[in-house]
Amino acid sequence: EAVRADGSIDTIERGQHLVVSVRPGANLRLLLTGHMDTVFPADHPFQSLTWLEPGVLNGPGVADMKGGIAVMLAALQAVESSPLGATIGYDVLINSDEEVGSASSAPLIAGLAAGKAAALTYEPALPDGTLAGERGGSGNFSIIVTGRSAHAGRNPH
């Protein structure tokens, strides 16, 4: 949401999110998440894909998050081909606003996560290959104050 100068609130849409639900009635359900946006705006020079060498691709979003989505797909193929695959349900969410704070997808994420046995996000590892257990975040806040305008030095009552 965004607060206008007059105090009214606008909803900010950040694109369409992809949700796939498989076996929603299963007793064991998982949530797998990722994102499709990148940190680079459309007019940034880093907008093309380049093969650096066979098997090594460079471009916006290749590691964060397309590499993670490829790992997610491999994990889902493993689930589907396992003997228990038919008993496991899952939702896959690929949101379109992760790099800008997930403002429009946060309620969707919370709703999909409810009641799941596990939720897995497929962000890339740290540069040395170790698991990223946490990352810094960001927040944007707006406050609406109502009342009568006054200044103690001019109107002490």
Predicted regions and their residues:
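Residues forming anionic-ligand binding surfaces in small-molecule and nucleic-acid pockets
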Residues: 61, 140-146
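Buried hydrophobic positions in well-ordered alpha/beta secondary-structure cores of metabolic enzymes
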Residues: 20, 32-35, 72, 92, ...
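Solvent-exposed residues in well-ordered beta-strands and their adjoining turns
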Residues: 21-23, 123, 144-148
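Glycine/serine-rich anion-binding loops at beta->alpha junctions
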Residues: 56-70, 151
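Acidic/His- and Gly-rich active-site-bordering loop/insert found
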Residues: 1-60
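Acidic/histidine-rich catalytic neighborhood of metal-dependent amide-processing enzymes
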Residues: 65-136, 140
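Acidic-enriched catalytic cores of C-N bond-cleaving enzymes acting on peptides and small amides
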Residues: 152-157
